[in-house]
Every structure is written in C-alpha cells, then in structure tokens.
Amino acid sequence: MNAGNPMRLALSHYLRTLRERDEFDRLLPELLTQMGYVPLVKPKAGVRQFGVDFPAAGRSSVDGVDELLLFVIKQGDIGRRTWSGDPNAVRESIEEVIDVWLASHVPPEYKDHRKVIVVATTGDLGQDAQPNWAGFATRHPQLRFEFWGADKVSDLVETHLLNEHLFDGQDRADLRKALVMGADSDYRFDHLCRLMLRQLGIALDGQLSEAGARQTVPVLLKALRRVHLAALVCSHWIDSESERRQALWVMERTLLWSFHRAVLQSLQERQDVQEVIREIWRSYLQAASRYYDAVAAHVRVKDGLSGYTREGAEYSVLLLEQVGLLASIGLSAALAEPGQDDAWRARSSEFATALAAMLRNHEAAASPRMDAQVIDICLALVLFIQTGQHNVARRWSAEITRRLNFVFMLGRMFPVGTDSFDDLVELDVHGTDEFKGLTRRYSWLLATMGSWCATLGQDSAYENLAENHANAYPDVGSQLWHPTADWPSTWYFEAAQHGSGSTEAPYPLPASAQALRDRIAQFNATGRLRWEENSPALAIGMWPLDFIACRHFRTPVPASMWYYLDSKPSHGIEQNSGTAVPPSQDPDD
C-alpha cells in the first residue's frame, strides 16, 4: 500500500475497525458487484455454510477466465492461534470448503468455473502464519487461493467503489482534501460537504438541484450509500487521529443531510430509503459511543475538562459544547423507538447520569457566556426530564437563572447575543458601554430560563429574575422562537430559525411565576406549538434526529418541549389538556 496516499491509509484504518458480521460482510458483496462479479447469496449469521460465507461468480480481470470466488470472512490479523486449532479457525474453515462445499454445493451452472478460495479479513496475514498459508496452498495445487487483507481490500475499494464511476474527479479530490485536513479541530469539512451536496442532488439553498430533480429512487439509494461510505472513511480516519468530536460531527452531518434529501421528495417512509438512513443512523451511534467513551472519565472528575483551556470565557464555551454533545447523545437513546436499538436505548439513564455528574463537577457550566448556548442547556434539561431526573433539571435551571440575573445586574460577564467568540473577548477586555448595549440587546436565555423555571416550579428563581429584569436591566430584550408548520423543510439542512418560524419579541416576564404559567396555558390552548406532530423523523421512529439537528445547526429547541411539561409524552404520542402547572415535588433522583 502506498503509505503516502491518505485515501488508502484512511480506508485501511477504516477496514480494520469493521466487525466481521454486519459490517465487513456487507461491504464485500457491494465491492464484488462493482468489480463485475455476482454475489450468489448474502452472508448470513447462524446458518451453516460449510465454510463459505458467500460465493461470487464472474470473469477475472487478469486473464479473462470465468471463476467462482468462495469467500471465507474473518476479522483482524491472522496468526498461528487463529490459523488452526478451533472449529472457526482459518484452516478448519478452508478444509470444510474443500471437503463439503466443493464436493456437493457447487451450483451446476458454475461447475466448469475456476474455483478460487478467498480468505478475506480486516487485518493482515501475520508472519508466523505465512508458512502455514503457503504450505496449505502447495498441498492443494488443483485449487487457487487468495488472501485479501485490509491493505488489499482498501486498494480494491479505492479502485472500484471510490472510482470515477461513483465519484468523479472533483469528488475524489474533495474527499482527499477532507482526509488531509480532517485532523484540524476547527475544520468543518467543507470539501466533504460539497461532495455530499453533489452526490445527493442538493443545491446550496437546501432545495433540489437540477441533477437532484432527475434522480430516480434507485439512483438516490446508490448516492446515499456512496455518501455514507465517504463519511465512514473520513470519520474513522480522523477518529484514529484522536479527533473524536470531529468524527462525530461528520456522522451527524451525513445523517441529517441524508434525511433532508429524503424529506425533500417525501421519500423517508419508503422501506428501501429507510434501510439506508438507518444504516447511517447506526454509524452515527457508533461514533457517538466512541466520543462518549473518550469523555466519560473526565466528566466525573472535579474540573476534569479544565486542562483543555485556560481562559474563563473559553472554558465556558468548551463546557457548554460538551453539555450539548452529551445531551444529544443521551436523547438519541432516550427518544429511540421501542423495539429498535434497544441496547442503545437502555443506556439513556447512563448518559443522563454522566451529564449530571459533569454539571456537579464543572460548576462553570451554569454560567453561559454566549446566548446561543441556550440550545445546549435546553437539550440537557429535556434529557433530564425524559430520563426522570426532574430534580437535577430543577436545580440546574434555577442555578443558571440566578447566575444569569446576577451578571445582567452586574453589567459584566453576561452572555453575548452574537455567535462571535471575538465579541465575547472584546466585551471582557475593553468593551465600551455602546458595545455592551449591542451585545445584550436581545436574549434568548432570559425568556427560555424564565419559562423553564416557571414550568419546573422554581418560582423564587423566576420571580427574582422577572423583578430585576423589570427594574435593573429593562434594556435587555427577552425573546423566544417557535417553529411554524413548515419547519421540516429546512430543519435537517441548516439553522431553521433564520428562514422560518415566528419570534415572540419582546417576551413578557410577568411578576409572578403563576402568571407566566397561565400565559403558557393560554398559548398551549391554541395548539400552535405541537411542532412534533409535523415531525417526519418522529413519524418513522427516529425522533432523536430533530434534537441532533438542533445542536448541530444551532437551532433553538422548540418551547413546546417544556411548555407541555406536565404531561409531555416520551414519544410525542399522547394528548394532554394543554394546562401548564408546576410539577409536583418528587424524591431526589
């Protein structure tokens, strides 16, 4: 393998991470198809196959001879221990192919084809097993043997799966650039995104391009699989460079844009489209699990994440980013459809508990410095509610509200109402009164935390906030955004609030919490906020996508997630009266 070729290096890394079942054995038939072979059966676990995981018939590109390839699939490196001595060892599998499959299972139409036994693995043939391999082949001169290790398969994948028939020159160039630049923690995979847009037929504005409008469903399915493969190569490559946050970002973007493409033509309920989307979903879960494993130990240590930055403002930004990531991972489990991904769904409490531990050990997470961090805060609160940790939600929302009130009264260290970290630094270092006024003209946090406190029964924290907002900092504009019925058209492609929805501005904060609850109840009675009723993701059992999109694109979490808090169903199915009341006190979670 060319060590200077980042594509092949990435492919080789990627292949070495695949499981034998459901991953490597799904890739090989697709590869063989592109090579001009016809896989005769699909690999099946639990079915006795007499050594052959799957056969494939075709014509050799080397000498033009018709041949029947008999694949024996293994995982990892082949050494002396995995060569022989176990019923599932390589030698025993090959002998079963010779003794049974070749003797009685060759289809009649292929009896004259040349027979080639191919041992395919995600690793290498170790030096200690190479003499055994050579000796075995010498003792069976009537047969041909080939070993396809990770390097060999990566060469074939690049040649046949990532070739000019699937990726044109520009796509291949963009994929290579994404691999080279992917280890940069600030890189946002512009090159990979351009590849995805071209493959999926999406224009820069999120609508169908001319090419996309011409795509048939079979063509789209192939494009989705190609995009998935390109994303996997990038994700695994940068994961190997210890950039798991970047690897997770790639899988988030691929999942969301693939689903957006399906929604553009209302194809998401087609079974064949769903199957491909769920394959990408499973890849997202794997990336999410790897990211969680990387940070889990740090969040349980007092200020365990402080080693990644020194500046106070930067530390707050880092912490709230981790809050949003852990919360979206937790919601991917908590809101998973029963009967699907049950093992992952069972981990929802684990993720919520880890997030609660992080908040205890990192008190600065209750001091947001950017108004957009309200998104991460809301995702965390929704996770706590969905997993039954109501008291954690109450305590943390009240603490954030108290600190928010304090910094606005102080006139320093308040969350800036822009997305610019430079504005935050400017404010802290030498912000003028005029600049301070500009950066706190509007606040999502005021309305959001005030309404969270009211619905969670944190009346004291709310009423203190409302009083001081009215008297000490009335210049701060409180506002709240609500999606409108057309929200799915952009939700999975970009930040939805810039081109759709409606904003309550100013958002009134009455003196008493009960007055705000009464106002929320009146709002609920209109039925305007049941945004999930229009969710194409919820309709097919993939509601977590809506919340992953909130964090990824920085779209505010819809207020209905806490406006209907007294009877919010786990999957948005049950109806309620629309009456907002503070929840009853329950024991500590």
Protein language model regions, located:
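Mixed-charge (Asp/Glu-Lys/Arg
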Residues: 1-589
